[in-house]
Swiss-Prot record:
GO biological process, one term: farnesyl diphosphate biosynthetic process
Region forming the signal peptide: none
Record keywords, A-Z: Isoprene biosynthesis, Magnesium, Metal-binding, Transferase
Protein name listed in UniProt: Geranyl diphosphate synthase
The EC number(s) this enzyme carries: 2.5.1.1
Cellular component, GO, one term: cytoplasm
Annotated positions binding Mg(2+) 1: D157, D161
Cofactor note: Binds 2 Mg(2+) ions per subunit.
Length: 416
């Protein structure tokens, strides 16, 4: 049985024996300053070349979210301990032990955008009478359910993309003794999420909504992942560049990112607070779309440039431009093809989707000629200003702070 080379940090692994029965009461009633002294899990950077800004907690600006992060750390041992309570545990123990190892290796080290916002915003959306210690605890459980599903999709992506590393360590399926057995592990992670719902939420008034929201998340995000692979022939690796359009990029963002990261997080939080109204959330599509589009396009930017002004070593530069090498539809690819001349288009078509660094560098040179970095910065600023103008117009009962927090998570500044 594979043994994890990298175990959970002490802030989580030691909490099993220290978990306070009063933790839900403390989070429901305490001031945030009482909850932030113990550091949570620090998410690791995806590679040594990731900007230093990403190695810091994205919640340093927000005391409430620091508290939510800490609370998720506190209940982690109990939530993951439910694996040992599966009726078949003793009979097929090695499989379920590996499930726990897969979760420990992949789930706690992300940014926890979904989980932290569910825990923090639950208290913002719920009626004060509904903010009981039990429901605070359930918000943390639901936060972990969302994070398990997030890791599930990341692991599938790693397998399909043949990725070697994620967040600075080997991907789960690349570890010795794992390989394509990881497919079973990700399927078990999905099923374990619904097992957690069945154990913790049967008495929650919005249990059916929560179950359906997660099921719909899986369906829509799988469609997005499938759509991502329609732009390149899986056998010949030939790319259909005519499909590299702004319209298709928007569709890709909607199904692969926006539904799963923003739309679904708001749905789950609303259902957790027992105020779920799909019509209200549908009204917010333009704002959630703009935030999500910016989130994905920033990922595309970081794949090419990392942070503005960052100086990279030569060895680190080789990890840039992965999207070019793998033939991904990105903001930069569709933008370049929409404004380039015939010579530049030929260079892109001749070099895009090829693994050699020389090929990706040729594409990057075209991007430089077209000043795509400058155009991206303009697009980012326009998006921020649009959100700054539109968020105050929301008047359907959902607090503006929800969208300001989402926006800060993407732009690192608040639209106020």
């Amino acid at each position: 049985m594979f043994k994890l080379a990298q175990r959970l940090p002490k802030s989580v692994s030691s909490l099993g024996s220290q978990l306070s029965k009063n933790a839900p009461n403390q989070l429901a009633a305490a001031t945030t300053s009482q909850l932030i002294n113990t550091p949570g899990i620090r998410h690791k950077s995806r590679s040594s070349a990731v900007p230093s800004s990403l190695s810091k907690s994205m919640y340093d600006h927000n005391e409430e979210m620091k508290a939510a992060m800490k609370y998720m750390d506190e209940i982690y041992p109990e939530v993951m301990g439910q694996i040992e309570k599966v009726p078949q545990y003793e009979e097929i123990k090695p499989i379920l032990v590996r499930l726990r190892e897969a979760i420990d290796y992949t789930v706690p080290y992300g940014k926890r955008f979904k989980g932290v916002h569910i825990v923090s915003h639950f208290k913002l959306l719920a009626d004060p009478k509904f903010i009981t210690p039990e429901n605070v605890k359930l918000s943390g459980v639901l936060g972990w359910c969302a994070e398990i599903i997030q890791a599930y999709f990341c692991m599938l992506d790693d397998i399909m993309d043949d990725s070697d590393t994620r967040r600075g360590k080997p991907t789960w399926y690349k570890l010795p003794g794992i390989g394509l057995n990881a497919v079973t592990d990700v399927c078990l992670m999905e099923m374990f999420t619904f097992e957690l719902l069945k154990r913790y939420f049967p008495k929650h008034p919005s249990y059916a909504d929560i179950h359906e929201i997660l099921r719909n998340l899986l369906f829509l995000t799988h469609m997005g992942q499938g759509y991502d692979f329609t732009f390149i022939d899986p056998v010949t690796r030939k790319i259909n560049f005519n499909d590299f359009t702004e319209e298709n990029y928007t569709k890709l963002c909607r199904y692969k990112i926006i539904f799963s990261t923003f739309h679904n997080t708001l749905e789950l939080t609303s259902a957790m607070a027992n105020v779920y109204d799909p019509k209200k959330i549908k009204q917010l599509d333009p704002v959630l779309m703009r935030i999500g589009m910016m989130h994905q396009s920033q990922n595309d930017f970081k794949d090419l440039y990392r942070d503005q002004g960052e100086v990279l070593k030569q060895a680190e530069k080789s990890v840039l431009g992965t999207d070019i090498k793998t033939g991904q539809l990105t903001w930069f690819a569709q933008k370049a093809l929409s404004i380039c001349n015939d010579r530049q288009r030929k260079i892109i078509m001749d070099n895009y989707g090829k693994e050699d660094n020389k090929n990706s560098e040729a594409v990057r040179e075209v991007y430089e000629e077209l000043d795509l970095k400058g155009k991206f910065m303009e697009f980012e600023e326009e998006s921020f200003e649009w959100l700054k103008k539109e968020i105050p117009k929301i008047n359907n009962g959902i607090p503006h702070k929800v969208f300001q927090d989402y926006t800060y998570g993407v732009f690192k500044r608040r639209p106020e």
